[in-house]
């Protein structure tokens, strides 16, 4: 795997607050290798290690994308939701930024059925067919469509399980992470000082609560994904 330059610098990471962890009482001892200090009751992440892990992860993401691998980005908490959607749209990959529906991956046949229903309803709406139905039936189907859009809108073009899943908050998305582990789908996780680095395949120690921190990490990963995808298109 070729090492590339992703313009990752410590000053930018500090400005984004990537180094701020949780209170020292909430830490996971397994995060000790990634923590450099305690400050005012808060653990401080070692940014030198974070920068190295992020750079290595970008190399891996580029390599996977250049081979046509499919990505799913997951982040459902309010601070991450919009950033996840923007990042995924930019990278032209799938995303979940609202509630993770249990079994979304492990019970893929059910998810696939819902996606078919979602696509059919969208097609009927675009064709104006819903307006031809009795008001009560039309209203019911529109509510159904709205519900599906909220929870499945980011994966509406997914035709199979993803090859790699990027998870913004290990604690918040634990169900999604467990499904990936069950299915053997590789995961890339942002891990704060209260997380377990052993649960994910690739871990990036970082503040997963600050918008600026989440944005910075996602931007780097998406840049690698976009470059890899462009390489795949050129060489196809």
From Swiss-Prot:
Query: What cellular component GO annotations does this protein have?
Result: chloroplast; mitochondrial small ribosomal subunit
Tell me one GO molecular function of this protein: structural constituent of ribosome
Cellular location(s)? Plastid, Chloroplast
Q: Offer one example of a GO biological process linked to this entry.
A: translation
Stretches that traverse the bilayer: none
Q: Which UniProt keywords apply?
A: Chloroplast, Plastid, Ribonucleoprotein, Ribosomal protein
Cysteine disulfide partners in this protein: none
Q: Which residues form a coiled coil?
A: none
Tell me which NCBIfam families the record gives.
Answer: rpsB_bact
UniProt-recorded name of the protein: Small ribosomal subunit protein uS2c
- Species name for this entry? Piper cenocladum
């Amino acid at each position: 795997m070729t090492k590339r330059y992703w313009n990752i610098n410590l000053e930018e990471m500090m400005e984004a607050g990537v180094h701020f962890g949780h209170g020292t009482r909430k830490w996971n001892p397994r995060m000790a290798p990634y923590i450099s200090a305690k400050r005012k009751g808060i653990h401080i992440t070692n940014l030198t290690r974070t920068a190295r892990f992020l750079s290595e992860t970008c190399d891996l993401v580029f390599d996977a994308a250049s081979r046509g691998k499919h990505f799913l980005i997951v982040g459902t908490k309010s601070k991450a939701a919009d950033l996840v959607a923007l990042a995924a749209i930019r990278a032209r990959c799938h995303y979940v930024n609202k509630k993770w529906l249990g079994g979304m991956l492990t019970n893929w046949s059910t998810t696939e059925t819902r996606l078919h229903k979602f696509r059919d309803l969208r097609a009927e709406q675009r064709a104006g067919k819903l307006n031809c139905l009795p008001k009560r039936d039309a209203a019911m189907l529109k509510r159904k469509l709205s519900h599906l859009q909220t929870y499945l809108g980011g994966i509406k073009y997914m035709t199979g399980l993803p090859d790699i899943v990027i998870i913004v908050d290990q604690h918040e998305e634990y169900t999604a992470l467990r499904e990936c582990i069950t299915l053997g789908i590789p995961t890339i996780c942002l891990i704060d000082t209260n997380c377990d680095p052993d649960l994910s395949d690739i871990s990036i120690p970082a503040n997963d609560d600050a918008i600026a921190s989440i944005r910075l990490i996602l931007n780097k990963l998406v840049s690698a994904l976009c470059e890899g995808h462009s390489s795949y298109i050129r060489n196809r």
